[in-house]
């Protein structure tokens, strides 16, 4: 072998060595390379540290596929490659190399874990004049054989011709074809080491002839085998393959599957008529076989469902009221009214079961109970208290989320004729837990929808009706299934969006939300210990004082429940855990508002607070939403004008009508209120409810609007320490409204301790927690003049009785 040296390269510094497994690179090739081994990564990093664009590396193949390359395990001839692109992924690198020249490494040295080598460029031997003709003939032969080889491999012929035609010189042609040819590493390395272009092309042509012969032989063998296999032999062969595949996948043949299904049906203790129907379909399955009909798989899936449903499996009820009370208290703080209602419900079931003399009477005693509806804001414990009921009864628990359900098939399932048909969610849950008498929570029934696919709310009517659900027929099953022993509990946030026929089947239990004191205790006893555990903290590593918990409740949450409170405590625990894990602190004690602010940032919530002083035209009202109750300041302003009346604040129609009723009342009784009669004619009146981006509606702002309006007209300031609510009529009568508990709790949270309510709402005060009720003073009014006297600090406002309306007389 002859070597030709150029003088330029020996002057180059030694290059880092990139060892390649099962890859030989040739000059003129640009190719991506994935680097992941430690030594190769070090070599690439050493090459990349070179200043400027001279980021070159010596790429050489390994003699074997060893994981840790050594100097003795590398060939001596490789290529000098320039690194053109680098992309990191995970712990490795993706490179694009352009191979510039062939080179030899007389020796390898390893310094600081990087293999380096002084490289000497190896140029191709110069061509002799007599070699030109032979080289041209060889080039044509290599091009033709390369196209033929690629065609056998499945590549398009036009693409192959374009590829080989783009090679300008013999050296470029032989290097590219040798790189892409499927040859063992030693044979490719031998091609790289040949410096004579003619010799290298002759060797490549021999390799191409040999590879083409191998491929043609493989094709002949395949054709001969396919011809020798007749139709019968082919069928036998395929069936044997199918059995082998089924065995590997753990599947059964038809007869074994049918026998297994028959055994399951016998053990399922099915009712007689259902067992008869199942056996009839099982006989059909045996006759058709799985391969002969697409219906066979549908039948098999249906029979699996019939056999797996718990037709007679149930759990025994253990109604122990003391244990039930202990479980409810253990899982939930507060909610006294709800717990009492649940215990009453369980007590009735206990007495009914004790009086039942037969299995039929026992079943009727279980099925005749009411359907409880837990109604209240998010995060107040509706779903979790249903789970506690299941624990108290010793029953299994299933939750079915119906939020956004718009298809009747969610309840009744799809008919078997549809592709991918499945039973409804009710039967899916019952099959999953394996009991016919679980506690099933139908979550978010107020968010059911309806579409062209049916109304799931209408489908629930049968499910929740004790007179019908003992024979509930799912569309997929097509057989009656007894749901009468299931204890259904529904949850919802809004009463108004539940379909009236569905609501009529339920008995609501109201979850009004928690007071700040209740939230404080829930955070201390339940939420904080849970978040400590989830973050891997011991009790002494994270302590949160009562003051800090109160600050979190008021400054970082605004809700009737405790869901956001738990998330905020979780964020607090995670930030403390990070500091402890980093070694910055040994334990965290959150004791003041500054500590909370340091960990959680500034407070995100701004609760409405009572006004600091009395002022005309501003009255404090109360409202409630699904997030709980709060206060609002209704503003009234009187200005020179033409008697126009303006209402702003994105008010609904009902609130606008309340404002107009208040204005009409003020005009009718201007003299008694001390308002000059001409003032209303020469003044414009503007009533505004702040937070204009939030839509508002409802009748309960009538009293507040009237007080603010009369205050603005008369110039008398409204007491800032009193909050009010109630609907008004044109005669000045104050009518009762709803949401008293939530509104009063919101006012109490805002620091207001005097509440004005309609007298007809007096009974609603019994729903208030004792600690809240004892700290407030209530004023119950029947008429608007009583409200004005109380809110404007007047002794009384005496209004004349309205004139009696004339009676209609029959002619």
Curated annotation (Swiss-Prot):
Give the EC number.
3.4.21.53
Please list the residues that bind ATP. 376-383
What is the main EC category here? hydrolase
**Active site positions:** 700, 743
Chief place of localization: cytoplasm
Q: Which UniProt keywords apply?
A: ATP-binding, Cytoplasm, Hydrolase, Nucleotide-binding, Protease, Serine protease, Stress response
A cellular component term (GO) from this record? cytoplasm
Source organism, top-level taxon: Bacteria
Q: Does the keyword Repeat apply?
A: no
Annotated Lon N-terminal domain ranges read 15-212
Summarize subunit and interaction data from the UniProt record for this chain: Homohexamer. Organized in a ring with a central cavity.
Name the chain's protein. Answer: Lon protease 1
- Which organism's genome codes for this protein? Sorangium cellulosum (strain So ce56)
């Amino acid at each position: 072998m002859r070597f030709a040296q150029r003088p330029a390269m020996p002057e180059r510094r030694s290059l880092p060595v990139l060892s390649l497994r099962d890859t030989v690179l040739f000059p003129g090739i640009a190719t991506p390379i994935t680097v992941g081994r430690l030594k190769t990564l070090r070599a690439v990093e050493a090459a990349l540290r070179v200043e400027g664009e001279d980021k070159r590396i010596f790429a050489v193949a390994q003699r074997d596929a060893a994981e840790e390359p050594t100097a003795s395990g590398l060939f001596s001839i490789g290529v000098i490659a320039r690194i053109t692109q680098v992309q990191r992924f995970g712990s490795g690198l993706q490179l694009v190399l352009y191979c510039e020249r062939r080179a030899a490494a007389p020796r390898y040295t390893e310094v600081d874990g990087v293999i380096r080598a002084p490289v000497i460029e190896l140029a191709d031997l110069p061509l002799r004049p007599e070699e030109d003709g032979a080289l041209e003939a060889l080039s044509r032969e290599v091009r033709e054989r390369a196209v033929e080889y690629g065609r056998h491999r499945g590549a398009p012929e036009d693409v192959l011709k374009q590829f080989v035609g783009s090679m300008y010189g013999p050296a470029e042609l032989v290097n590219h074809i040798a790189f892409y040819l499927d040859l063992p590493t030693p044979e490719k390395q031998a091609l790289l080491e040949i410096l004579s272009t003619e010799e290298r092309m002759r060797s490549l042509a021999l390799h191409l002839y040999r590879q083409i012969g191998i491929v043609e032989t493989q094709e002949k063998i395949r054709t001969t085998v396919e011809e020798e296999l007749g139709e019968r032999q082919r069928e036998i062969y395929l069936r044997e393959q199918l059995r082998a595949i089924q065995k590997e996948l753990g599947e059964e043949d038809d007869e074994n599957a049918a026998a297994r299904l028959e055994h399951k049906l016998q053990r399922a203790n099915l009712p007689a008529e259902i067992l008869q129907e199942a056996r009839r379909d099982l006989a059909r399955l045996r006759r058709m076989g799985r391969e002969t009909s697409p219906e066979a798989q549908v039948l098999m899936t249906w029979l699996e469902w019939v056999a797996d449903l718990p037709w007679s499996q149930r759990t025994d009820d253990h109604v122990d009221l003391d244990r039930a009370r202990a479980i409810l208290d253990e899982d939930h703080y507060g909610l006294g009214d709800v717990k009492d209602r649940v215990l009453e419900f369980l007590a009735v079931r206990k007495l009914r079961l004790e009086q039942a003399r037969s299995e039929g009477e026992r079943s009727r005693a279980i099925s005749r109970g009411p359907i409880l509806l837990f109604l209240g804001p998010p995060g107040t414990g509706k779903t979790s208290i249903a789970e506690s009921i299941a624990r108290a009864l010793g029953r299994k628990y299933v939750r079915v989320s119906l939020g956004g359900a718009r298809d009747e098939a969610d309840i009744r399932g799809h008919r078997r004729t549809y592709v991918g048909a499945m039973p409804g969610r009710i039967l899916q849950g019952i099959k999953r837990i394996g009991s016919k008498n679980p506690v099933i929570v139908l979550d978010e029934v107020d968010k059911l929808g309806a579409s062209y696919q049916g109304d799931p709310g209408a489908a629930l009517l049968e499910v929740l009706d004790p007179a019908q659900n003992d024979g509930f027929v799912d569309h997929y099953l097509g057989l009656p299934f007894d749901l009468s022993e299931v204890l259904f509990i529904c949850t919802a946030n809004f009463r108004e969006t539940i379909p009236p026929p569905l609501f009529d089947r339920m008995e609501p239990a109201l979850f009004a939300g928690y007071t700040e004191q209740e939230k404080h205790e829930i955070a201390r006893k339940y939420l904080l210990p849970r978040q400590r555990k989830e973050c891997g903290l011991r009790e002494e590593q994270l302590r949160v004082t009562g003051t800090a918990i109160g600050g979190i409740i008021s400054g970082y949450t605004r809700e009737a429940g405790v869901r956001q409170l738990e998330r905020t405590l979780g964020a607090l625990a995670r930030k403390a855990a990070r500091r402890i894990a980093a070694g910055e602190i040994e334990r965290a004690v959150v004791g003041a508002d500054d500590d909370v602010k340091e960990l959680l940032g500034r407070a995100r919530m701004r609760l409405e607070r009572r006004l600091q002083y009395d002022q005309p035209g501003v009255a404090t009202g109360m409202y409630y939403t699904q997030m709980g109750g709060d206060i609002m300041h209704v503003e009234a302003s009187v200005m020179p004008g033409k008697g126009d009346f303006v209402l702003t604040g994105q008010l609904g129609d009902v609130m606008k009508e309340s404002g107009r009723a208040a204005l009409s009342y003020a005009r009718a009784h201007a003299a008694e209120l001390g308002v000059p009669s001409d003032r209303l004619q020469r003044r414009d009146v503007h009533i505004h409810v702040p937070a204009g981006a939030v839509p508002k509606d409802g009748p309960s702002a009538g009293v507040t609007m009237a007080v603010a309006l009369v205050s603005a007209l008369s110039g008398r300031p409204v007491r800032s320490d009193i909050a009010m609510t109630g609907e008004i009529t044109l005669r000045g009568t104050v009518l009762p409204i709803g949401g008293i508990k939530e509104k009063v709790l919101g006012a109490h949270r805002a620091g207001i301790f005097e509440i004005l309510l309609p007298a007809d709402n007096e009974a609603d005060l019994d729903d208030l927690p004792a600690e809240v009720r004892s700290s407030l003073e209530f004023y119950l009014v029947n008429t608007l003049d009583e409200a004005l006297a109380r809110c404007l600090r007047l002794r009384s406002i005496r209004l004349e009785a309205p004139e009696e309306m004339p009676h209609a007389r029959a002619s």
